[in-house]
């Protein structure tokens, strides 16, 4: 994707923005949890729970691109939370999630048509 964007002189930043999907917080309640080799005990009371962030591959003022060959287990939920964040913040950038070289070429063609009047 990087080489296609560069070859077509499409302005972007690689991992240029980090989005906070869920803020970190302190969990005050008791939370009895088991780990692989340890018994079930209160593991969370008073401890910080890490936030959830998302950093797309390529960003610009017009679009966001996440190149995904195979999504890991957490990606579908993270992607939904990301879309919700964009919606709630009235972010109107176009989202692209190509999964193959052919998809990447289609994305570049669409970006050129939408934002560069078909050329650079």
Describe the function of each predicted region.
Residues 1-120:
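Electrostatic, structured charged patches in enzyme active sites and in nucleic-acid/phosphate-binding
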């Amino acid at each position: 994707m990087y080489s296609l964007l560069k070859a077509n002189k499409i302005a972007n930043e690689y991992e240029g923005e980090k989005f906070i999907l869920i803020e970190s917080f302190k969990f005050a309640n008791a939370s009895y949890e088991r780990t692989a080799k340890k018994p079930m005990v209160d593991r969370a009371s008073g401890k910080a729970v890490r936030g959830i962030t998302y950093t797309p591959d390529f960003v610009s003022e017009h679009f966001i691109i996440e190149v995904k060959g195979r999504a890991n287990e957490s990606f579908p939920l993270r992607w939904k939370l990301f879309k919700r964040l964009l919606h709630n913040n009235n972010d109107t950038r176009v989202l692209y999630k190509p999964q193959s070289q052919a998809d990447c070429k289609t994305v570049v063609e669409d970006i050129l048509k939408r934002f560069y009047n078909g050329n650079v």
